Amino acid sequence: MVQVAVLVDFPAVAADSEAAVRREVGNMTLINEQQQIKVQKAIEQAESNTDAELVTVLAGQSDDYYFIPTMWAALIALVTPALLLQTNLWLSQTDLLWIQLIEFVVLTVVFRWQPLKLALVPKQVKFARASLVAKQQFLAQGLHHTQAETGMLIFVSEAEHYVEILADRGINKLVADDAWSNIVNHLLGQIKAGNTEAGLTGAINACGELLADKVPATHNKDELPNHLVII
């Protein structure tokens, strides 16, 4: 399933940042060093024709979700006595308490296995955490401090299968949301096919063409680093 959301205003912490398009991503593998260089060159090429500043961030995971194993283990341990009482087993209250305790400890450990833990996290929670990290990265990379408010972020979070594009108000007032949606859809298709580097460079090139038309270069500038950021 692909989830879509468009934000016209961020919370106060990111009040200078506007316009977000996000999607769920299928299976993905982070890119290697040579591919990172290709992405960097794509960013440099895109920025050569626009006053916009483009940053691309890849996150392995947006949250540790430490509470998830404990929450599920506690929930299952809580309902276990009620289920056991429906059987013909002769169990004392002490027996039930020991079963609950052992079950809670074992399940807490088992549920910390990364693939299982991520499967237990509700999709809405994963998307919310990834979206929060995207906004934090927008601020952390200084995209809200560009001279003409023309910062833009392409954010990908691998574990959450999540992609989001954020653009500052200087870009947002000139570019329709549908334009970002088309770019993200193409990026999603490439990543789901296992072509992460091709997807990123394609998205960067498409953003570069769009920004060159809407926010053309008027002076030599390079306010922010062009390398791919991996967190």
What are these language model-derived features?
Residues 1-27:
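Periodic low-complexity repeat segments enriched in small/acidic residues
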Residues 17, 51, 154, 203:
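Residue-level signature of catalytic and energy-coupling elements of molecular machines
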Residues 29-54:
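Short, charged cytosolic
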Residues 31, 169-228:
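A membrane-cytosol interface segment of integral membrane proteins
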Residues 65-76:
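Select subsegments of transmembrane alpha-helices in polytopic membrane proteins
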Residues 85-120:
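Transmembrane alpha-helices and immediately adjacent membrane-cytoplasm interface residues
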Residues 123-141:
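Membrane-cytosol interface motif
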Residues 135-167:
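Acidic, Ser/Thr-rich low-complexity segments on the non-lumenal side of membrane proteins
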